[in-house]
From Swiss-Prot:
Plays a major role in the shutoff of the host protein expression by cleaving mRNAs probably via an endonuclease activity. This host shutoff allows the virus to escape from the host antiviral response. Hijacks host RNA splicing machinery to selectively target host RNAs containing introns for destruction. This may explain the preferential degradation of RNAs that have undergone co- or post-transcriptional processing. This is Protein PA-X. InterPro entries: PA/PA-X, PA/PA-X_sf. Belongs to the influenza viruses PA-X family. One of its GO terms (molecular function) is RNA binding.
Length: 252
């Protein structure tokens, strides 16, 4: 799973996921399913935000990479991916500026068009079950919830899906591709099932030589589809800006 994650996701996303796990004392090399889940969630948050801007009239517009008007204000502020101290600093700044109600839990995004915080969910289960879990945890009507699944389903607060259909389809397609690639490498079942995940973890530990004396065959084949999985959705200029913004505060 770790090899898959490093080949499948943008290096910046992998780096942010590693830092997030280490912040909580977790090891990406051991808890590989969580590593994959965090990378997937980060990517969906970035895709949710990318190419969405607010023009001088306060209207939401979609501008593709390379457009000369790309200096317009981004519609979404990305909170997910920052260390907790910086994330809360951003949230407090937004609340002071917009007078939005401060959330009890760190949200993933802030939508400047709708003036609300957004919680993004990516689930391997039924969307309505995960939605209810999120809503029960947050307990706030002020935070908008949007759930995506690997099967193409989605659910959002008051059926308000925020983004246009094409932008949401892009996210759903990416999630479906990740699922298909995991399945082709025999990783999907362990990603979905906790019991299967434990079995896969034991297998991974053996392959790393931590269970010496137990024979195991490890496949090093790389799926051809992985060669075209490098995400092309992210504005290269914004990628650099996001990297600098997210990582500079973590340097010691």
């Amino acid at each position: 799973m770790e090899d898959f994650v490093r080949q499948c996701f943008n290096p910046m996303i992998v780096e942010l996921a590693e830092k997030a796990m280490k912040e909580y004392g977790e090891d990406p090399k051991i808890e590989t399913n969580k590593f994959a889940a965090i990378c997937t969630h980060l990517e969906v948050c970035f895709m949710y935000s990318d190419f969405h801007f607010i023009n001088e009239l306060g209207e939401s517009v979609i501008i593709e990479s390379g457009d000369p008007n790309a200096l317009l204000k981004h519609r979404f502020e990305i909170i997910e991916g920052r260390d907790r101290t910086m994330a809360w600093t951003v949230v407090n700044s937004i609340c002071n500026t917009t007078r939005a109600e401060k959330p009890k839990f760190l949200p993933d995004l802030y939508d400047y068009k709708e003036n609300r915080f957004v919680e993004i969910g990516v689930t391997r289960r039924e969307v309505h079950i995960y939605y209810l879990e999120k809503a029960n945890k947050i307990k706030s009507e002020k935070t908008h919830i949007h759930i995506f699944s690997f099967t193409g389903e989605e659910m959002a607060t008051k059926a308000d899906y925020t983004l246009d259909e094409e932008s949401r389809a892009r996210i759903k397609t990416r999630l479906f591709t990740i699922r298909q690639e995991m399945a082709s490498r025999g990783l999907w079942d362990s990603f979905v099932s906790p019991r299967e995940a434990k079995r896969q973890l034991k297998k991974d530990l053996k392959s790393q030589g931590q269970c010496a004396g137990l024979p195991i065959t490890v496949s090093h084949r790389t799926s051809p589809a992985l060669k075209i999985l490098e995400p092309m959705w992210m504005d290269s200029n914004r990628t650099a800006a996001l990297r600098a913004s997210f990582l500079k505060c973590q340097k010691k």
